[in-house]
């Protein structure tokens, strides 16, 4: 909301007061700043009651809100017409014009009068809508909104007129002068004709993979590049270098402890000489490992057959084997003999291996 100038002030205003109170002869427009010369003033035109309005213009005149108990400070709140209100007003004017020609179309005058009364009633209701009184346009005691008692009241009708320099002296008496502050409420609603999707082309598809708002990360496992952009990639690379460096330092320290000799030097030849000899002294480590791990499966099968034959021959022959007497009955017990024979065969296999 903003304070408007006198050029946009309404032509007529009205003030509600009790019948036994004195009226204010004129109202000066409070523009929030000192003005050397007042160019416009609201002069008291007449005083009427609510039942004796002579015209529709008087009944729809803006009503001032009392903002001080001395009945000399008022507030006029009016709403700026939006585009929709202007269109509605034009539509009503067009309908009214069409209604005025109904009689020419041959309709009865009673129906014509009913249509005109309906249009006037809707127009008057729309114009007489009022908002709640505001308390923030005056400071101090003036900020208190005074409510009138429910007694017999009248309306003072004021007319906006230009004031001349020679008429200023007539309104020097402060008791007969009041003040009105005109406040305009600006409708900040979004324009109906503006489309928020107007800037986007019809050829653009929001579901398209190449749409500018659809940004898919290349590496879903590493979210650092998404959060930090190119800096995140540099941080990730730096972290990998740090891990590699730590692993190298750990291996180096372990290697130094393992191969450092008593004389303080690295005895590499003594530590890994045996391993080098087993690999055949070859630079190709893989080939050396394969050649040193050659397994003769035929020879192993022959050894297994020989050992099995020896075991079978031992079981068939009456051989001597050491006896173990764990119990007094082991001397003549056949199970004890069989047990000692098995122990003897197992011991022979252990000795061969």
From Swiss-Prot:
GO biological process terms on file: nucleocytoplasmic transport; protein import into nucleus
GO cellular component annotations of the record: cytoplasm; nucleus
Gene from which the chain derives: IWR1
Compositional bias (Acidic residues): 192-208, 300-319
Subunit description: Associates with RNA polymerase II. Part of a complex consisting of RPB1, RBP2, RPB3, RPB4, RPB5, RPB7, SPT5, DST1 and IWR1.
Basic and acidic residues bias locations: 77-92
Effect of inactivating the gene: Leads to a K1 killer toxin hypersensitivity and pleiotropic effects on gene expression.
Motif window: Bipartite nuclear localization signal: 10-43
Protein name (database record): RNA polymerase II nuclear localization protein IWR1
Classification via InterPro entries: Iwr1, TF_Iwr1_dom
Function: Directs RNA polymerase II nuclear import. Binds RNA polymerase II in the active center cleft between the two largest subunits in the cytoplasm. Then uses an N-terminal bipartite nuclear localization signal that may be recognized by karyopherin alpha to direct the polymerase II complex nuclear import. In the nucleus, is displaced from polymerase II complex by transcription initiation factors and nucleic acids, enabling its export and recycling.
């Amino acid at each position: 909301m903003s304070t408007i100038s006198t050029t946009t002030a309404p032509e007529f205003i009205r003030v509600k007061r009790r019948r036994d109170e004195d009226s204010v002869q004129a109202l000066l427009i409070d523009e929030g700043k000192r003005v050397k010369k007042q160019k416009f003033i609201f002069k008291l035109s007449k005083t009427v009651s609510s039942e004796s309005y002579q015209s529709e213009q008087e009944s729809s005149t803006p009503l001032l809100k009392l903002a001080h108990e001395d009945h000399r400070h008022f507030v006029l709140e009016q709403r700026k017409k939006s585009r929709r209100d202007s269109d509605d007003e034009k539509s009503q004017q067009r309908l009214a014009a069409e209604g005025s020609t109904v009689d020419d179309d041959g309709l009865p005058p009673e129906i014509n009068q009913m249509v005109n009364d309906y249009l006037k009633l809707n127009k008057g209701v729309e114009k007489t809508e009022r908002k709640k009184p505001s308390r923030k346009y005056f400071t101090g005691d003036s900020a208190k909104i005074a409510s009138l008692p429910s007694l017999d009241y009248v309306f003072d009708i004021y007319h906006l007129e230009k004031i001349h320099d020679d008429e200023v002296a007539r309104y020097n008496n402060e008791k007969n002068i009041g003040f009105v502050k005109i406040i305009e409420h600006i409708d900040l609603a979004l324009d109906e004709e503006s489309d928020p999707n107007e800037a986007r082309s019809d050829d653009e598809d929001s579901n398209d993979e190449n749409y500018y708002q659809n940004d898919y990360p290349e590496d879903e496992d590493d979210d650092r590049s998404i959060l930090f952009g190119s800096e995140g990639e540099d941080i990730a690379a730096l972290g990998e270098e740090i891990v590699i460096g730590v692993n190298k330092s750990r291996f180096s320290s372990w290697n130094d402890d393992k191969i450092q000799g008593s004389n303080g030097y690295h005895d590499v030849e003594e530590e890994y000489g045996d391993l080098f000899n087993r690999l055949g002294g070859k630079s190709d480590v893989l080939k050396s490992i394969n050649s040193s791990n050659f397994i003769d499966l035929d020879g192993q099968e022959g050894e297994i057959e020989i050992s099995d034959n020896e075991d079978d021959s031992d079981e068939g022959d009456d051989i001597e084997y050491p006896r173990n007497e764990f119990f007094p009955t082991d001397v003549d017990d056949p199970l004890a003999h069989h047990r000692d024979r098995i122990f003897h065969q197992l011991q022979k296999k252990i000795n061969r291996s």
